[in-house]
A protein has these predicted regions:
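C-terminal motif of bacterial Sec signal peptides marking the signal peptidase cleavage site
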Residues: 17-19
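Bacterial N-terminal signal peptides that target proteins for export
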Residues: 1-9
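Bacterial signal peptide processing site
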Residues: 21-23
């Protein structure tokens, strides 16, 4: 009887040990799978332009935390892609001094800072570009986005006014959009004193700034203010509230912008659910785009916002607006302004500057 009991107990122990070993093995496999790069993300990584990858690798080395996991005040302290560009330039032995322009001058538009860039060449009166930086209405400022205004001032032969705006969540929608429109009206009113031509004022923006540049064009039409002569929209935010487009699905885990970050930005900026249906915020929900200024729309392949940027370009075309649309493969959100280290960024900057020059010459 004892022998049988001992044998039974030993058998039970052996079965339990095998089960535990199997569970541990399964747990290890699950852990390994969780830490591995998702197949879709790995596929997007394989499409990266080598120069773009170098910037993203450098950004990763700066040790920033995920923006979407942080309070806004902490998110604003994280390294930006512009920091990665400067770090990479240092490693390459390149000068990190800003691209020279004719001159710069810091101003105030209401209570918001602004920086005015004059071109090195050309003669008065210059055309003007009112530029709005990116950052999801939450992070970044005119200092972070210094490279683009310099490139455009130089290459388009225009005065560029980089206009700051109030940030969320301290200031909810439509605060930033109202500030953007106020900056545009300030440019019209002060163009002559800056040495510019008030009849040749364009708007331009990147990401959230591209969204606001599009909205400013709508607001000018609605309020019967002189409309911009042109709008340059670089990977504009198309809407808040929906994150299920083809490019959102394909680039949900992309860097430096992913789906979770866009949800975070919109959550911080939107004050009430119905804001998400406002065409000034969700430009792809606009019902009437007829009569808006001609546009250049730039998108990039590895970017959650690519589909919406293309959608808005198509909507403008369908409304009879003259549109120049170009998508850049192998690069990511924020590539524009990286012309010192990414050739495709240099090409995109030249494309926008050329289109602006053409608009100003008419």
């Amino acid at each position: 009887m004892k022998t049988t009991l001992v044998s039974t107990l030993l058998g039970m122990v052996l079965v339990f040990a095998i089960a535990c070993s199997s569970d541990a093995s399964r747990a290890k496999t699950i852990a390994n799978d969780a830490s591995a790069t998702p197949p879709a993300a790995a596929d997007r990584q394989s499409k990266l332009d080598p120069q773009m990858k170098a910037v993203l690798d450098e950004l990763a080395s700066l040790g920033g935390k995920p923006i979407e996991s942080l309070p806004p005040e902490e998110a604003r302290k994280q390294p930006a892609p512009a920091d990665a560009v400067k770090s990479l330039m240092k490693k390459k032995g390149m000068s990190t001094e800003p691209e020279p322009v004719g001159k710069t001058e810091d101003r105030k538009i209401g209570s918001n800072p602004a920086r005015v860039y004059w071109p090195k060449e050309g003669k008065k009166p210059y055309p003007l570009v009112v530029y709005y930086h990116g950052g999801g209405w939450v992070i970044a400022d005119i200092n972070v986005y210094d490279a683009t205004p310099r490139a455009i001032a130089d290459q388009a032969g225009a005065i560029v006014i980089s206009a700051e705006y109030r940030h969320a969540p301290e200031h909810k929608f439509p605060s930033a959009h109202d500030d953007a429109f106020a900056a545009y009206k300030w440019a019209l009113a002060n163009a002559k004193s800056l040495g510019g031509d008030p009849k040749k004022v364009a708007v331009m923006g990147e990401s959230a700034g591209g969204n606001m540049a599009a909205a400013v064009s709508m607001m000018a039409r609605e309020q019967k203010v002189q409309m911009p002569i042109y709008q340059a929209l670089v990977y504009p935010v198309g809407q808040c509230g929906r994150y299920d487009s083809k490019s959102y699905n394909e680039n949900a885990m992309a860097k430096p912008l992913n789906k979770a970050m866009m949800e975070y930005f919109c959550k911080n900026y939107v004050s009430k659910p119905e804001d998400q249906d406002n065409p000034h915020l969700s430009i792809v929900k606009a019902k009437d785009l007829k009569g808006l200024p001609a546009a250049t729309v730039i998108t990039d392949e590895i970017d959650p916002l690519m589909s919406e940027g293309k959608q808005y370009a198509d909507m403008l075309k369908d409304a009879g607006v003259n549109v120049e649309y170009k998508n850049y493969d192998g690069v990511t959100h924020e590539f524009f302004g990286m012309g010192t280290v990414v050739d495709k960024a240099k090409d995109a900057e030249a494309k926008v500057a050329s289109d602006l020059r053409s608009a100003f010459s008419k």
